[in-house]
Amino acid sequence: QKLSDITYDEMLELATLGAQVLNNRSVEMAKKYSVELEVLSSLVKEPGTIVREVAKMEKMLIRGVTKDTDVARISVVGMKDIPGNAFKMFSKLAAKKINIDVILQSVGRDGTKDISFTCASGHADEAVEILEDLYGLEGATVTCDTPVAKISVVGAGMQSHSGTASKMFGALYEAGINISMISTSE
């Protein structure tokens, strides 16, 4: 459904998450200089969507949905639960220019923890190799699931309205999609 308007921040989040509507840099520049953008169709002559600082709050809590199917989920299971382990892990990955997206940490048993994250599929093998070198001798297990898809739901106020997550999870359930990781931000 076409929106009459959307905020810079919502459009920037959609662009960053893979919506192929506007380049995220163009939205950043428009926001920086307070320039309204109008996204138009090249196929039909109709009013487009205005990207601006403050959007008229329509009744829709969900402003957009994106998908990224070029994703790998990597998990390190059973790593020692000591200060600095996450720093070491993500520093090694950053040194190899591997961009990390969603991060999930859970406390394991017997003084261990598990960390899972997503990255581009093209970096999965290198990331696994780095992590096996780093944690393999400590008894941790590194796993990689690819391909996986990341679905992002964008909207202002989603956390303050009960039932929004339930509806989204219900739609995934109806489509037969199993959820591997969940992350929220607002």
Language-model features and meaning:
Residues 1-185:
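C-terminal catalytic "cap/lid" subdomain
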